């Protein structure tokens, strides 16, 4: 397959290579703890992102047994969380670069086997009105801050669960469901999908534990020159990195951004910042769970592909993220799908929510700055 060489664009990060290579999960965790301080010192010295903003896409239900794995006491079946997109910009090589992190097209994501089954169970009306709430789309958010499709250089997702990027990147053949008469024309004419090679490689041969969360057939006709494979940890630009954090999936990675308040980390390994500090949580059960087990984190465990590896990745995220200014025991970890309170989910309201980040000014390449909204 003809794809771009990420090594020509991004800098390889090597601080965690010994930890990644260690097959012993306990020793691996020790190596992660040892590597984090050196990584943080180096990463902060690379500079800061020029813009880092979040945008709400959709609030929807999700099984509590996955979101707060084994920890929450509430008898409810579902929690509610808000899925968000992040716009990240940095300056390098005399220009501004723009990354969309988690630009989920939620209408197409609803065709994922798990969510399609839930919609059949509860019906279209309840699923799309009472049980979920749609904010603005990816396109609307970009328009609101003055960005055009051609301004986007890269898109990425922490992993490919639920994703369908055909409209974003274009296809080589007509698509019966969205473009039956002609190949799909890319909405983002220049954007490349940054994806871990390990994540991409599982798509043709999904395990039964994985199948209900992916739409592998939706990637078969993606234009080859739109794929940008990475292997492990990479620095995208000053103050912006992707950190390989497997476990939830084999190719999971986390967005790492240096800002005026320090380092932020984002992924879906955990659904709340307090899942990384459960002893500080007011959600019934989480503090007791942490005290009883000694666990430092509460996993988002819908696939349980590699539980100890996901645990280690979450500890890595927790240690890399700097503490919140207003609550030093809570890390600046911003879940890409963040837990929120809901009338139908008593006993699951988080004690702490980031809700929004807005650092710096989003600009058009070669244009004037526009304050993000």
Which residues are covered by each model-predicted region?
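Catalytic metal-binding/acid-base residues of hydrolase active sites
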Residues: 106, 161, 199-200, 246, ...
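Metal-dependent catalytic neighborhoods of phosphoester/phosphodiester hydrolases
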Residues: 166-177
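Conserved beta-sheet core of the metallophosphoesterase superfamily
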Residues: 177-179, 185, 250, 256-274, ...
């Amino acid at each position: 397959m003809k794809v771009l060489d990420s090594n020509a664009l991004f800098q390889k990060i090597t601080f965690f290579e010994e930890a990644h290579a260690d097959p012993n999960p306990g020793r691996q965790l020790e190596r992660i703890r040892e590597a984090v301080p050196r990584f943080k010192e180096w990463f902060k010295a690379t500079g800061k992102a020029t813009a880092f903003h979040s945008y709400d896409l959709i609030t929807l239900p999700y099984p509590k047994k996955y979101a707060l794995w084994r920890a929450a006491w509430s008898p409810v079946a579902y929690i509610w969380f808000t899925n968000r997109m992040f716009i990240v910009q940095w300056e390098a090589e005399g220009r501004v670069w723009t990354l969309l992190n988690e630009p989920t097209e939620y209408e197409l994501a609803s065709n994922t086997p798990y969510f399609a089954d839930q919609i059949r169970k509860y019906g279209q009306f309840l699923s799309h009105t009472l049980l979920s709430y749609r904010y603005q789309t990816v396109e609307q958010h970009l328009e609101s801050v003055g960005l055009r499709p051609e301004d986007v250089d890269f898109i990425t997702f922490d992993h490919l669960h639920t994703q369908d990027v055909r409209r974003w990147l274009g296809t080589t053949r007509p698509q019966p469901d969205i473009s039956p008469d002609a190949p799909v024309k890319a909405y983002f004419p220049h954007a490349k999908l940054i994806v871990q090679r390990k994540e991409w490689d599982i798509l043709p041969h999904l395990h039964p534990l994985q199948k209900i969360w992916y739409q592998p057939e939706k990637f078969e006709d993606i234009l080859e020159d739109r794929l940008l494979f990475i292997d492990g940890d990479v620095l995208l630009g000053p103050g912006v990195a992707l950190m390989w954090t497997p476990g939830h999936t084999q190719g999971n990675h986390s967005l790492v951004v240096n800002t005026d308040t320090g380092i932020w980390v984002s992924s879906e390994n955990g659904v709340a910042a307090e899942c990384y500090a459960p002893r500080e949580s007011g959600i019934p059960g989480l503090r007791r769970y942490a005290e009883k087990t000694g666990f430092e984190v509460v996993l988002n465990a819908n696939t349980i592909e590699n539980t100890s590896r996901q645990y280690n990745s979450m500890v890595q995220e927790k240690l890399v993220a700097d503490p919140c200014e207003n609550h030093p025991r809570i890390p600046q970890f911003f879940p890409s799908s963040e837990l929120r309170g809901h009338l139908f989910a008593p006993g699951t309201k988080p004690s702490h929510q980031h809700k929004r980040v807005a650092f710096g000014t989003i600009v058009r390449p070669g244009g004037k700055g526009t304050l993000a909204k």
